[in-house]
A protein has these predicted regions:
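Class I S-adenosyl-L-methionine-dependent methyltransferase catalytic core
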Residues: 1-320
Length: 320
């Protein structure tokens, strides 16, 4: 179950700034559709069994709600926890105060409360960090690769797997479908994903891929004005809109950037063949696979997404 409620303790962003209360998150509830829960459970089993024998684990659902995940677990190896249990068999407890088993291997799987900008979900993950695997439905903030991403505050766990959930993955208390953009992620205490990911958080004080390009945020949107040097005084090699729906266009001037906000890309190499290859690469990349998906179904593109795309295609650039 997903429960969003008023938080008493002040929460903070990755940069340390205190969060403001979001009144829309007070006493709101929705539940994971059974078919979606089944897909998440099956994916968790598929990924984990590559590393361990599933028979060695007990399964734990925190914030169990109506037990949509709990009912999928082996009957003799399952624990359900909820602060307000809706059925018999669950342990009545705030998961953040629950003492996790230390003598058994544990897979923690479920849909924790998100809280404002995912901070409560972060607390659930960090409390579960002594579990062998943590498999949670999470807000899209956990997909972000920006330097302030909340996922860089996960302690003692490694991200093994992440996928975006399908549309209408939830139902409300009236059994009506609810479409909230979320991801399903699998974290491990012991194992790491062999596919490396570019971390802008670790490179935030550097100029990533400076041998190829420099990237600037440019905007004339109200209260977001920035990068005016590359709007009025200098011309970038090309521009991209930072907000788009189905596809994105590479344009030659800021005037063509949609919504007055975008990214200016400036070549740093004098190698014309390399620059041509770079521009072609930017046109061919499926940016929906890199950009962040917002609740209104639009995509937001930032520096971190561009750096990840370059990181994934370095072999093409180096073969020059």
């Amino acid at each position: 179950m997903q429960t969003l409620f008023k938080e008493v303790t002040p929460k903070r962003y990755a940069n340390g700034n205190e969060m403001k209360e979001n009144s829309s998150n007070v006493l709101d509830q929705y539940f994971t559709r059974p078919s979606v829960a089944l897909k998440c459970f099956q994916k968790a089993c598929e990924v984990i069994k590559k590393y361990e024998n599933l028979d060695d684990f007990i399964f734990l659902e925190p914030s169990a709600g109506d037990g949509v995940f709990y009912d999928l677990f082996p009957k003799n190896r399952r624990i359900g926890i909820d602060i307000e249990p809706k059925r018999d068999g669950f342990i009545q407890c705030d998961f953040l105060n629950y003492k996790l088993p230390t003598h058994q291997k544990v897979i923690c799987l479920g849909n924790p409360p998100f809280g404002h900008r995912g901070v409560m979900a972060l607390e659930f993950i960090n409390h579960a960090r002594n579990c062998d695997f943590v498999c949670f439905i999470l807000p899209m903030f956990f997909e972000s690769q920006g330097k302030g991403s909340i996922k860089y505050r996960v302690k003692g766990l490694n991200l093994l797997y992440s996928e975006r959930l399908e549309k209408n993955a939830f139902i409300d208390f009236k059994n009506k479908e609810v479409d909230v953009h979320c991801v399903f992620q699998i974290w491990s205490k012991k194992y790491q994903n062999k596919k490396s990911e570019f971390s802008w958080y670790k490179n935030r004080h550097k100029e990533p891929f400076g041998e190829y390009i420099k990237v600037f945020t440019v905007s004339l949107a109200k209260n977001r004005e920035c990068g005016k040097e590359w709007i009025f005084n200098q011309k970038a090699s090309f521009y991209l809109s930072s907000t788009f729906y189905k596809s994105i266009q590479i344009v030659e001037s800021f005037e063509e950037v949609k919504y007055k906000s975008g990214i200016a890309v400036v070549f740093t190499s004098a190698n014309k063949a390399l620059n041509t290859k770079l521009k072609k690469l930017f046109k061919e990349i499926d940016w929906t696979k890199y950009a962040s998906l917002a609740t209104n179904s639009c995509y937001h593109l930032g520096k971190s997404h561009i750096f990840q795309a370059l990181y994934d295609h370095l072999d093409i650039l180096k073969d020059n």
